[in-house]
């Protein structure tokens, strides 16, 4: 057919197969595969994803060559079916559906019955001997085409249907007569004409088809589709395919019907056909929930022949694809047709059970089982979720960013203090902390709360990062909230909420509900353990956790962490009884004054480290020395300033002056990290003594072999690291002599300044290990701060400058190059240099795959992300061996 050099833009179903997903999209590839398996598929063809990409490259026009191939395929379809497109005696009708290579909900809706017009509908009525059915099909087509292709709102048409039903005093659409439907068609065309500035509803089937194809291509770039792609790491240049398929009708009477079924339960994973169907209905009716469907088992009574054939074919499909299938089928006058099949979407719990069952049934290997788990979705398994029945009754009042997964319900509080106080007074109290944004001193209140809701901040804001670390549910950046923190109230979704009112948050979807919705605790079951054991067997990357408290450490170890990759020491200073002491240290005018305050802190810091080492039972821990700028510890509230002035025998003015003097214009790049230790070496001395004494004492008391890993943050120069390292070594050796211990210890650094990555070979002369702080490394490489980027990144996504948030997914082109280079340069100086990553990226699957490739030794992430990292590391290793 096609001349030499002509590109193939259109494939008939029998010309493709399941491996052609990239070209034919998921749906097209599966329809091709099912056709080749001899399944009863209404015939059709697929317009490729390349045609979609070409449409965008060609200023949103479909080139002549592609149109020609589409109409040639229509001609073939006419021959196969013995019907003609646009014929008034025996018209060919088709459906038009989108199909990207990754399943994307919210892409373009289906168009059914394309090819009908004022004349063809008469021929169709005659041919089928069923005028009511013919006019109903035309009515649906006008409605779908107007809505989906021309963006005339569905509600306009629904309103007319309701008016006609009220006029005729009837309740259901099915009671409308052929005459009623004719009236609807006339009124629908009138709505179309008004909405389209006087243009008539298109009567030419060729024109209808081309408009529909363009609409599918356009739907690839709707805001909804762009957002979904960003959340699921789907590249924007993939494009979508279009499937054109001969119509079969489930609405021809009592021996026709349509349904959707799964070969296993998508919520639990239990084996067995699960689904529903409707007699005398068209495909979209089931999905749209217009009428209440019957369970699929009822089909056995209604049409036993069809049911048996359906079960046989469903099992054949599952065996062929070796995975749970989600199938759409139609029965036309007793004959069964499959419209599509795909690997079914499922909950994380179901995914784990299905993967294990398929291994037990001998259908897949443990390696395949691990590769099939969507690492990100494991969040669902580890956090509480809402009771499904209770959720149905809940009222959604808003939606924002799903910053930290889980479900939470509780009383509204507006300050961290109140959250802490209420929970202290009553251990069973559940509170939701609602803030404009959170800051480090809110940490205890955040810990006390069941959930956190913020007006500002993105997926990587302070609230989001801390909440994920604690495993607390968090919804962030809900700009629709008007909050009055003074009056302790906020408005959202048309309601005003006061302190003490109940709200519920779903951190997995970002939805906010009115009232108190019941939650169910997560249980980590046997199958979860099996998948994790397999993952550990296949992965080569180590997995550690970022933790600052013994409770977090225990949780992380339970979830499989092999140690701590980042213990932030500053969080230990924010607690009530310690903050006055660190403030004293900061405000002291003399070294003696500072040392005296630090000696008081030493007791606390050492006790913290001992508790951490005990919880770790001999596993390694990397301790990061004090990192934030000092002003973060200073008082802002008037009464705190007064108390501090009294305590230090200073005036309130003096305290305020000192605080003002410490204020920085750009604290992120200011006096922080190792710069503090260079100016105040006594801080590093105190921290070293605390780490060393704790390690030696736990070794003596519990017998664990501990090798302290001391990490100096924010180094950009070898001499700077050497200066601090000398202070650390001097103190460490002193402690060893006092305690008569021969303990080994390591001193390393955080690579978070681009200069450190560029000079990694020099820095490795002093550092025994590197840990990449990718949060700061990303900020400094891009030159925008994590807290401010949210304000403009949305415009960058819309303009397709960036496709994903560089703070959530490691930017492999830029920041990744620095990481890979630093590993290589560092090991050229010190071949046994241990390298890990401890930014938020340590829990992101695509970033973990990069770390595997770059030759890192371990990743470190928040406790609840440890299982995600274990699976992702195994998947990276398995994908490597496949290549």
Functional labels for PLM-detected ranges:
Residues 357, 509, 769-772:
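Acidic, metal-ion-coordinating active-site neighborhood of RNase H-like domains
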Residues 2-394, 429-432, 439-444, 450, ...:
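Nucleotide/phosphate-binding sheet-loop regions of phosphoryl- and nucleotidyl-transfer enzymes
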Residues 363-448, 512-517, 528, 532-536, ...:
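Protease-associated
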Residues 335-337, 439-447, 451-453, 459-466, ...:
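Glycine-rich phosphate/ribose-binding loops and adjacent secondary-structure elements
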Residues 45, 455-457, 476-479, 567, ...:
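Short beta->alpha connector loops at strand-helix junctions that form conserved
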Residues 338-341, 498-546, 552:
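C-terminal domain-closing interface element
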